[in-house]
Swiss-Prot record:
Catalytic activity, reaction form: N(6)-[(R)-S(8)-aminomethyldihydrolipoyl]-L-lysyl-[protein] + (6S)-5,6,7,8-tetrahydrofolate = N(6)-[(R)-dihydrolipoyl]-L-lysyl-[protein] + (6R)-5,10-methylene-5,6,7,8-tetrahydrofolate + NH4(+)
Cytoplasm in keyword set: no
Name of the featured protein: Aminomethyltransferase
Record's subunit section: The glycine cleavage system is composed of four proteins: P, T, L and H.
Gene Ontology biological process terms from the UniProt entry: glycine decarboxylation via glycine cleavage system
Keyword field: Aminotransferase, Transferase
EC number: 2.1.2.10
PANTHER family recorded: AMINOMETHYLTRANSFERASE (PTHR43757), AMINOMETHYLTRANSFERASE, MITOCHONDRIAL (PTHR43757:SF2)
Pfam families per the UniProt record, alphabetical: GCV_T (PF01571), GCV_T_C (PF08669)
InterPro entries for the chain: GCS_T, GCS_T_bac, GCST_C, GCV_T_N, GcvT/YgfZ/DmdA, GcvT/YgfZ_C, TrmE/GcvT_dom1
Length: 364
């Protein structure tokens, strides 16, 4: 039977259509996915992300351990509360998961990992942490609410006490701070500003209700997916998995190649891939009628006249832009246009960078 987050009852009270999402009963929408999407782009919306896994790591060798575990380098994290995004790779360079890591003190870091990959992530982390003497605490006592949109921070701040407001004042993106019962982070999965707020399970329902009263719109998985796709953000199992290199998933920027003597899991495989080349992730835009869908083939002819085929990893109608967009994994050599096979029609598409909307504005 699917698990329920501490906010399950609040979702039903708000009229949510609930679905099983990787073993969790989660809201798909609360009546209109489109309205929820627009609320985040123009005002403020919120998502229950309590199904994600928060993992606290403690020990004198925690930084050393994470420098080995992750492709990005936590040596960059020197200010308490600073976070970074990284892939956690296997020995062949495939992506076990993508995650956020927070630095608090030399012996205390926090990971936030995906729900669908929870068990394999915890197994992998535990296996590799043992030689470093790391104490691992899975924070199942915490719920998490993502409040996103141009007015999200101001509306959320109406629920904060003076100390909490002071703690987040002027906080830059990709930082987190513990302020009373709330862990407040300037992170998100929408391409908008906002907070991801972790708090004790028993306080989550009251906090959710207070956000509703503050004018923050409840949003479901449907809007979360169209928002992240417009923002060009990867979804695990679609843009990447254990067989796909981060170099083929627009995650090259998350690999810290320097210092050259840092050994991390997957490094040797990645260096070979970098030398020989990989596929790459691009954006596709189709302004004609129709919708680009996952797994549709993408065909193009390179400058030498050779024909190639890639695949759409995520596709949807963009509510913000009013036409169809997609992320696609394709061979090197693609130009500015390609063809997507939709049923029996060959549809022309424009090839772009894999990001379409940032802070409510079109960039594709």
């Amino acid at each position: 039977m699917a698990q329920q987050t501490p906010l399950y009852e609040q979702h039903t009270l708000c009229g949510a259509r609930m679905v099983d999402f990787h073993g969790w009963m989660m809201p798909l929408h609360y009546g209109s996915q489109i309205d929820e999407h627009h609320a985040v782009r123009t005002d403020a919306g919120m998502f229950d992300v309590s199904h994600m896994t928060i993992v606290d790591l403690r020990g004198s060798r925690t930084r050393e351990f994470l420098r080995y575990l992750l492709a990005n380098d936590v040596a960059k994290l020197t200010k308490s509360g600073k976070a970074l995004y990284s892939g956690m790779l296997n020995a062949s360079g495939g992506v076990i998961d993508d995650l956020i890591v927070y630095y608090f003190t030399e012996d205390f870091f926090r990971l936030v990992v995906n729900s669908a990959t929870r068990e394999k992530d915890l197994s992998w982390i535990t296996q590799h942490a043992e030689p470093f003497g790391i104490e691992i605490t899975v924070r199942d006592d915490l719920s998490m609410i993502a409040v996103q949109g141009p007015n999200a921070q101001a509306k959320a701040a109406t629920l904060f006490n003076d100390a909490q407001r002071q703690a987040v004042e002027g906080m830059k993106p990709f930082f987190g701070v513990q302020a009373g019962d709330l862990f407040i982070a300037t992170t998100g999965y929408t391409g908008e500003v906002g907070y991801e707020i972790a708090l004790p399970n028993e306080k989550a329902a009251d906090f959710w209700r207070a956000l509703v009263e503050a004018g923050v719109k409840p949003c479901g998985l449907g809007a979360r997916d169209t928002l992240r796709l417009e923002a060009g953000m990867n979804l695990y199992s679609q843009e990447m998995d254990e067989t796909i290199s981060p170099l083929a998933a627009n995650m090259g920027w998350t690999i810290a190649w320097e210092p050259a003597d840092r050994d991390f899991i997957g490094r040797e495989a990645l260096e070979a891939q970098r030398e020989h080349g990989t596929e790459k992730l691009v954006g596709l835009v189709m302004t004609e009628k129709g919708v680009l869908r996952n797994e549709l083939p993408v065909r193009f002819t390179d400058a030498q006249g050779n024909q190639h085929e890639g695949i759409i990893t995520s596709g949807t109608f963009s509510p913000t832009l009013g036409y169809s967009i997609a992320l696609a994994r394709v061979p090197e050599g693609i130009g500015e246009t390609a063809i997507v096979q939709i049923r029996n029609r060959e549809m022309p598409v424009k090839v772009t960078k894999p990001v379409f909307v940032r802070n409510g504005k079109a960039v594709a």
